[in-house]
């Protein structure tokens, strides 16, 4: 058994309840009485998901945000969270808790409980959070398995900022200070918007969050849905900060499309819902961009300016 995919495949023999969705989605979906509960869990590990010298408050914010992103992808309203904390330096822990409180307030997801553990000295610290949400009434909870041929492919926000933000945080990137700060903020404090997920849920056929990279997550959606997805690389939305620092070349776009930590929404919807999707984004003042189409077939295809573009060897982050 090697890698995350093989391990998850082995877990499927245990997670046979329909609520687990075959361990092929961003969250579990559990019917309880007249309510639909959405449950998700993520872990952040020092040296993997955050830098050892990242501010503790930013680490806490990211822990909450990545879970809220999963709830958003299911169109769920945040209900509460539980988390486990690896105890360490008292001052660091106090700053972490301040960031946790700030994030829980920002995303309206109250802390309900959790666990603590004392780590051996010099061990990388890790933190896990389980988020609970409620699905929209009279609306199926979106999955990544229901994209249909003829759908348009959409993404929210802008793509690739966090990767450059990580480089900026490491001092590896040159450019205008204001733009570097903007990019670093996207890495340190992603800001998923559950209200957009809620608004989109009745309109989409498939939806997931972009966490490991736009291309690899689109490929996963295509595989899960048994369809092909064609994306126009030239239509992928980039921020002004990214363009100012990295340019708007095919290479820069490919780098952005294979980066992770975006925590935007990737979704497919019938063409007749285009106006309502744009309206949902407009009401919330959030960018939504059509970047491709769902096709009969399988796999992922890329183009730019109407010409085919070869897929890169690495589509995104692999665990």
Task: Describe the function of each predicted region.
Residues 151-157, 189-214, 218:
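Internal active-site segments that recognize and position negatively charged phosphoryl groups
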């Amino acid at each position: 058994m090697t890698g995350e995919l093989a391990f998850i495949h082995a877990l499927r023999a245990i997670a046979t309840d329909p609520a687990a969705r075959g361990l092929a989605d961003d969250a579990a979906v559990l019917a309880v009485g007249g309510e639909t509960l959405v449950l998700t869990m993520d872990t952040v590990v020092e040296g993997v998901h955050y830098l050892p010298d990242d501010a503790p408050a930013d680490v806490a914010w990211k822990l909450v945000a990545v879970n809220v992103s999963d709830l958003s992808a299911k169109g769920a309203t945040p209900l509460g969270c539980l988390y486990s904390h690896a105890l360490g330096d008292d001052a660091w822990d106090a700053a972490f808790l301040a960031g946790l409180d700030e994030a829980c307030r920002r995303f309206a997801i109250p802390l309900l409980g959790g666990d603590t553990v004392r780590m051996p000295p010099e061990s990388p610290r890790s933190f896990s959070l389980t988020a609970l949400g409620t699905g929209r009434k009279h609306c199926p909870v979106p999955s990544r398995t229901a994209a249909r041929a003829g759908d348009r492919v959409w993404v929210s926000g802008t793509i690739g900022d966090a990767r450059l933000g990580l480089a900026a945080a490491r001092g590896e990137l040159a450019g205008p200070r204001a733009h570097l700060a903007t990019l670093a903020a996207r890495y340190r404090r992603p800001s998923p918007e559950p209200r957009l997920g809620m608004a989109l849920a009745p309109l989409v056929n498939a939806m997931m969050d972009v966490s490991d990279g736009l291309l690899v997550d689109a490929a996963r959606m295509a595989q899960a849905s048994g369809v092909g997805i064609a994306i126009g690389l030239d239509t992928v939305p980039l921020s002004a900060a990214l363009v100012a620092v990295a340019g708007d070349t095919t290479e820069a776009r490919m780098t952005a499309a294979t980066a992770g930590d975006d925590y935007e929404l990737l979704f497919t919807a019938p063409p007749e819902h285009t106006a309502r999707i744009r309206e949902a984004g407009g009401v919330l003042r959030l960018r939504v961009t059509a970047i491709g189409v769902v096709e009969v077939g399988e796999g992922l295809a890329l183009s730019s300016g109407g010409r085919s573009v070869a897929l890169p060897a690495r589509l995104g982050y692999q665990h």
